[in-house]
Amino acid sequence: MMGVLEDQVIIVTGAASGIGMATAIAALREGARVFGVDIAPQPATLKENNKFRYAQCDLAVESSIDSVVSNCLEVFEGRIDALFNIAGVMDHHGSVDTVTDSDWDRCIAINLTAPLKLMRAVIPTMRAHKRGNIINMSSRAGVSGAAAGVAYTASKHGLIGLSKNVAWRFKGDNIRCNVVCPGGVATGIISNMDPSQFDHEALDTIKPILGAVYSNRPEGYTQMLPEEVAETVIFLASDQSARINGAVLPVDDAWSTI
């Protein structure tokens, strides 16, 4: 039985862990050929798949983006059918009066500028083939001011605006661009950070919101897994969502309702 992404060529950033790796695995399951990208080494779970290629690089470096796209085109015969911008970094919950330059610069570079440059690089190929699908990973922080620090919040809000502009501008070329906004997901994006660097005063203002989010859960509730978010990405990349373009889709157990 053919998968819903059969023979499509897809670039997946953040493919070494979390939502990115889960999405790469799901895309391969659905028949896609995947070019994975991450700053971390290639995950062992994907090394033996002959439809998977990998580039270890820092997307904050512009030459890395050019290399990723050119290598993907070379390996997969001049095609890029879809781009999943999933790579992301978190801030230390700093507010506008405490955010460090390093937090701000890194969040904007990885969460906003890299997706823009990758889209800029793949759009010509997609336009030439009159088909393309771009899915950008935002966050609850992309639609709320009370979910993260100012750097992460600004970068994820910006990504939504960027995506809407791309969706409108290139709809005539049969290129779709949608956004997924996950809530709390069991990944390493926060656990890998140093809590001593957090702005705890700013973080304390968010805790009541988080308390409301995680209250009133059904019996047996568990935190959302990367694989659950990945299935949403696969749906948006498939022909089942052919009329969905420019959408911002929350995957957050009703967090977006408050």
Curated annotation (Swiss-Prot):
Pathway: Secondary metabolite biosynthesis; terpenoid biosynthesis
Enzyme class: oxidoreductase
Positions bound to NADP(+): 12, 58, 120, 152, 156, 185
Keywords (A to Z) from UniProt: NADP, Oxidoreductase
Enzyme Commission identifier(s): 1.1.1.-
Gene3D superfamilies attached to this UniProt entry: NAD(P)-binding Rossmann-like Domain
Keyword NADP among record annotations: yes
Biological processes annotated in GO: secondary metabolite biosynthetic process; terpenoid biosynthetic process
Deletion consequences: Abolishes the production of 15-deoxyoxalicine B and accumulates decaturin F.
The keyword NADP belongs to this UniProt entry's keyword annotation: yes
PROSITE patterns linked to this entry: ADH_SHORT
Active site per the UniProt annotation: 138 (proton donor), 152 (proton acceptor), 156 (lowers pka of active site tyr)
UniProt-listed CDD domains: SDR_c (cd05233)
One Gene Ontology MF term: oxidoreductase activity
Matches recorded under InterPro entries: NAD(P)-bd_dom_sf, Sc_DH/Rdtase_CS, SDR_fam, SDR_superfamily_enzyme
Biological role: Short-chain dehydrogenase/reductase; part of the gene cluster that mediates the biosynthesis of 15-deoxyoxalicine B. The first step of the pathway is the synthesis of nicotinyl-CoA from nicotinic acid by the nicotinic acid-CoA ligase olcI. Nicotinyl-CoA is then a substrate of polyketide synthase olcA to produce 4-hydroxy-6-(3-pyridinyl)-2H-pyran-2-one (HPPO) which is further prenylated by the polyprenyl transferase olcH to yield geranylgeranyl-HPPO. Geranylgeranyl pyrophosphate is provided by the cluster-specific geranylgeranyl pyrophosphate synthase olcC.
Family the UniProt entry places it in: Belongs to the short-chain dehydrogenases/reductases (SDR) family.
Comment field (misc): The 15-deoxyoxalicine B cluster is a rare cluster that contains its own geranylgeranyl pyrophosphate synthase (olcC), in contrast to other related clusters which rely on a FPP/GGPP synthase localized outside of the cluster.
Protein name: Short-chain dehydrogenase/reductase olcF
Gene (name only): olcF
